[in-house]
């Protein structure tokens, strides 16, 4: 699909040097003074002692008699709070505006994810992996602005359009080799049978890559998360699994009516802990399909302003998703289960994932704030929710030595919000500055640049958003 390139210099707080994610080149020094700091190394909020950023990293922290000649000094006020950048491990860029299949949205979404404070996003299964690879490389070169993009490549399993049901473990291994050679370090399985999943996990690990899975109850040819954990999977999406998901029906059919089984829940929680497997809860993804009665789903971002005028016109005559009682029940159960998982000592294994392939009513990049609010609504403390969104995600993808906390020597991926999120988690919505790769962006400028960019500009472009129509 067509990429509409935005002039990078217009969106930056200071000039950009074209540079990949890991490269170190000469950059201006930035000093952040004032405000308060939640560094995610623990659960406390402190006065910001002063942060010095150079060459994309935090190089000093603390009271300084620093010669700031030539540096950009940003003076924050008492209402500002500095946080580590958010890590969204189920960040779909795919949209389905025309009920004709999902297509990757690569114009406005990178700006909006970053403007929301998500400095690292994992795509969790791609419909157009070549498109997402081009976007990742453009961001890494500095030609585009967006989060650190952890691309997954295509879905592995029947969720992939055109999936060959005669696939063998050997063919899976060959494809893993191909995608890792193209820069994929994290894979996503969905609707994949056991022998193929085992091959995917083993071959990915040979490349030091990770695997996550949208799995099932064990019904039919689906794989229960407990079985996948025994295979060595790194992360699980959506459902904890175990005996609390009976294998007599699909997960979506059995979960809403299953009788709560504390012993089964305790066993699967212990299995996650013993194998250090992370759980991506994706709570709010299910609420989108429910009644959406809570303020979790308020349109505080005025999301429609980011759609192209043409798409707004088309969608104005569409009926959005009607509530589905089964998904409302799943949403409520997930709120209950995530708190129980946290209280069982598995809080360090929870990660944040938004998972919302938008049909236009809501836009996925704003989901990180809804998911944070859902954790708190479930009964998880605000500080723990922030750690879930930062250091937990970094650990889950093997990047905790580089991102996830604000510490000297780590990459300078930071978010500055107005208002204390430990007092009201909804204050994370008030993003004023985002720093990624050590470069400071005004969130308002990113949002302004994204206005009217999401979706086709006219009927001639609409076919690019209708992949199933061309099959």
Task: Show which residues each predicted segment covers.
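Metal-associated gating/positioning segment near the N- to mid-region
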Residues: 80-141, 160-162, 220-234, 241
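Divalent metal-dependent hydrolysis catalytic cores, especially in the metallo-beta-lactamase
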Residues: 109-130, 146-156, 180-192, 201, ...
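Active-site-adjacent beta->alpha loops and helix N-cap segments on the catalytic face
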Residues: 128-134, 191-203, 249-250, 271
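Active-site neighborhoods of metal-dependent hydrolases
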Residues: 178-186, 234, 244-378, 451-457, ...
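Acidic/histidine-rich helix-loop elements
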Residues: 91-105, 156-168, 245-258, 318-330
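Histidine-rich, glycine-flanked metal-binding segment
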Residues: 37, 41-83
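Acidic, glycine-enriched loop/beta-strand segments at the rims
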Residues: 37-50, 62-64, 363, 381-386, ...
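Bacterial N-terminal signal peptides
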Residues: 6-18
């Amino acid at each position: 699909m067509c990429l509409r390139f935005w002039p990078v210099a217009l969106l930056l707080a200071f000039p950009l040097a074209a540079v990949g994610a890991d490269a170190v080149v000469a950059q201006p020094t930035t000093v952040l003074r004032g405000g308060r700091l939640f560094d995610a190394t623990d659960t406390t909020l402190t006065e910001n002692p002063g942060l010095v950023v150079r060459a994309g990293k935090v190089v000093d922290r603390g009271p300084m008699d620093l010669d700031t000649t030539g540096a950009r000094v940003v003076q924050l006020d008492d209402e500002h709070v500095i946080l580590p950048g958010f890590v969204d491990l189920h960040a779909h860029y795919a949209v389905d505006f025309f009920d004709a299949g999902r297509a990757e949205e690569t114009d406005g979404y990178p700006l909006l994810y970053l403007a929301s404070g998500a400095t690292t996003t994992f795509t969790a299964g791609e419909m157009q992996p070549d498109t997402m690879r081009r976007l990742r490389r453009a961001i890494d070169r500095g030609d585009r602005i967006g989060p650190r993009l952890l691309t997954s490549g295509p879905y592995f399993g029947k969720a992939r359009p055109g999936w060959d049901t005669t696939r063998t473990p050997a063919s899976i291994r060959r494809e893993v080799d191909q995608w890792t050679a193209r820069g994929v370090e994290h894979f996503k399985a969905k609707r994949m049978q056991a022998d193929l999943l085992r091959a995917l996990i083993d071959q990915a690990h040979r490349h030091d890559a990770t695997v996550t899975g949208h799995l099932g109850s064990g019904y039919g040819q689906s794989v229960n998360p407990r079985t996948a954990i025994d295979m060595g999977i790194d992360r699980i999406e959506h459902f904890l699994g175990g005996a609390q998901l009976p294998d007599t029906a699909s997960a979506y059919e059995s979960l809403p009516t299953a009788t709560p089984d504390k012993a089964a829940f305790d066993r699967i929680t212990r299995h996650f802990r013993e194998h250090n497997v992370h759980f991506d809860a994706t709570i709010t993804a299910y609420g989108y399909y429910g009644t959406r009665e809570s303020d979790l789903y308020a349109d505080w971002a005025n999301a429609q302003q980011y759609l192209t005028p043409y798409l707004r016109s088309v969608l104005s005559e569409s009926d959005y998703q009607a509530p589905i009682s089964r998904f409302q029940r799943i949403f409520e159960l997930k709120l209950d289960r995530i708190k129980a998982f946290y209280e069982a000592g598995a809080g360090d294994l929870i990660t944040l994932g938004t998972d919302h392939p938008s049909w236009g009513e809501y836009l996925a990049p704003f989901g990180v704030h809804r998911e944070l609010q859902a954790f708190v609504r479930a009964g998880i403390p605000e500080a723990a929710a922030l750690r879930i969104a930062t250091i937990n995600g970094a650990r889950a993808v093997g990047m905790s030595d580089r991102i996830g906390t604000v510490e000297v020597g780590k990459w300078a991926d930071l978010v500055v919000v107005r208002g204390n999120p430990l007092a009201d988690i909804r204050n994370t919505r008030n993003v004023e500055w985002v720093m990624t790769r050590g470069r400071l962006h005004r969130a308002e400028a990113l949002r302004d640049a994204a206005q009217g960019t999401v979706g086709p500009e006219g009927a001639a472009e609409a076919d690019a958003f209708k992949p199933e129509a061309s099959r």
